Amino acid sequence: MIRAVTRAVRAAVRPARAAAPLASTSASARRPAGAREISALATRENILRAAIAVFAEHGFSGARVEKISTAAGSVDRMIYYYFGNKEGLFVAALEEIYRRFNAAEAGLALNEAEPVESLRAVIGFALDYYRKHPEFINLLNSENLHRGVHTARSPRLREYSSPAIGVIARLLRSGVAKGVFRADVAARDLYLLIAAAGYFYQGNRFTLSAFLGENLESPAARAHWESFVKDMVMRAIAA
């Protein structure tokens, strides 16, 4: 009799014990999913970071997928998984360097009530950014050698140009309202003037140093150029 009762109790308890791990298994399955998403994002970011460095050093044509995956501490198939192919990765790298530029510029403490000083700050920022981020110049040089075929495939680059030009447009409007800037200057033209002055100097600093017989990378030479560009821009747009 006692044995029969004991067996009945064990039979009743057994399903409950078996059911308990189901809830635990379900919860643990949810947790790794979030961890996998974080890991996937980190893998993609590592690949993109490595790609920018490798493309900057070797250009699009010279960069090899296996070199990028090795630099990222990953494997080739992950590049194809996240970016499709080397071309897709290069487009993503170009988008990323523009995104970084905009993010850095957005951190400037600009006062639209002081358009002259704020515009001078924008010019100084642009020239300094080109100097501190040679990968920006190098990737654009490589893309221009390919006649912009990769940037043409990106739907985001036009989106990234809007904030950069928008900063200048707001300062121009403020300056016009205060009577210190001409009203017939387009923000696009001013953006091109500033970008050209910074890009050309940084992108050609080695050959120009040899051609001119002076070190254009010296602090004194850079300070002189920045002062000259600021003065040139202000004279061009002064009312």
Language model regions located:
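Amphipathic alpha-helical segments used for helix-helix packing
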Residues: 132-155, 204-212
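All-alpha amphipathic helical-bundle segments outside canonical DNA-binding/catalytic cores
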Residues: 117, 155-160, 177-193, 224
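Hydrophobic/aromatic residues within well-ordered alpha-helical segments
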Residues: 86, 93, 97, 101, ...
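Amphipathic alpha-helical linker/stalk segments
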Residues: 93-122, 152, 158-159
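Short hydrophobic clusters on alpha-helical segments that form packing/core surfaces
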Residues: 47-55, 126, 233
